[in-house]
């Protein structure tokens, strides 16, 4: 399944109301920091009870041992995917991979490169005088070398990364907006069809689906556009 629906909800109740209108055979769902902080692991279990595979989007970033423990705790919940910040470095990422393998977990582990809301000036503010795409390339290569399953990247960078890294690597792309949607707070955006053509393997889509009058029909429309 290529579509991951971002559950931008504050409560378990709101999240479950959203997934009531979705088909778990057509999409996976993403639980982020706000929802998980409000509701904890119970919201993951409830979504799994509704047969949804969960991407736990908590972007762990800490010393290697602490990050690996957090990743394994997420895997203990049975989530399909979890992520870390690639800027945590090689040792941090390699430790996470080693612990997942040691525990025989099936959870996919990916890394965040450059947040999609960040442009060159934002990077400059934190001491990186570099174009976002160059930093993305650097961190994506490090992620692959560290043994992770993929990265989060913008669709504009997907084609470059596919050529740089090869086929056996997931490119999970937020900032996806169907034709006519608002950009909201994502700076580097593109349509679902173009993202898939450029090499993305999974598309993270939130408000265009969850705020639609009929979320299932919107989801089916997006799937048809990338078929």
Swiss-Prot record:
Catalyzes the decarboxylation of orotidine 5'-monophosphate (OMP) to uridine 5'-monophosphate (UMP). Keywords: Decarboxylase, Lyase, Pyrimidine biosynthesis. Belongs to the OMP decarboxylase family. Type 1 subfamily. Pathway: Pyrimidine metabolism; UMP biosynthesis via de novo pathway; UMP from orotate: step 2/2. HAMAP family: OMPdecase_type1_B. NCBIfam families: PRK00230.1 (NF001273), pyrF (TIGR01740). Homodimer. GO terms for cellular component: cytosol. Its EC number is 4.1.1.23. One of its GO terms (biological process) is 'de novo' pyrimidine nucleobase biosynthetic process. It comes from Acinetobacter baumannii (strain AYE). This is Orotidine 5'-phosphate decarboxylase. Gene3D superfamilies: Aldolase class I. Substrate binds at residues 8, 30, 57-66, 116, 177, 186, 206-207. InterPro entries: Aldolase_TIM (IPR013785), OMPdecase (IPR014732), OMPdecase_AS (IPR018089), OMPdecase_bac (IPR047596), OMPdeCOase_dom (IPR001754), RibuloseP-bd_barrel (IPR011060).
């Amino acid at each position: 399944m290529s579509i991951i629906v971002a559950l931008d909800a504050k409560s378990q109740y709101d999240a479950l109301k959203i997934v009531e209108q979705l088909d778990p055979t057509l999409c996976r769902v993403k639980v982020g920091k706000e929802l998980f902080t409000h509701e904890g692991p119970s919201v993951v279990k409830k979504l799994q009870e509704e047969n949804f595979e969960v991407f736990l989007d908590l972007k762990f970033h800490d010393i290697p041992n602490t990050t690996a423990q957090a990743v394994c705790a997420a895997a203990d919940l049975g989530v399909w995917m979890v992520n870390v910040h690639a800027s945590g470095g090689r040792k941090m990422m390699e430790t996470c991979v080693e612990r997942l393998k040691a525990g025989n977990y099936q959870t996919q582990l990916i890394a965040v490169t450059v947040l999609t809301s960040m442009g060159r000036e934002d990077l400059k503010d934190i001491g990186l005088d570099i174009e976002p795409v160059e930093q993305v390339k650097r961190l994506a290569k490090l992620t692959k070398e560290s043994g992770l399953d993929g990265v989060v990247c913008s669709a504009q960078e997907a084609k470059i990364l596919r050529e740089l890294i090869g086929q056996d690597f997931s490119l999970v792309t937020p900032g996806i907006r169907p034709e006519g949607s608002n950009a909201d707070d994502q700076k580097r955006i593109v349509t679902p069809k173009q993202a898939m053509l450029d090499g993305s393997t999974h598309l993270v889509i939130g408000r265009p689906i969850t705020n639609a009058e009929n979320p299932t029909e919107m989801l089916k429309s997006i799937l048809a556009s990338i078929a």
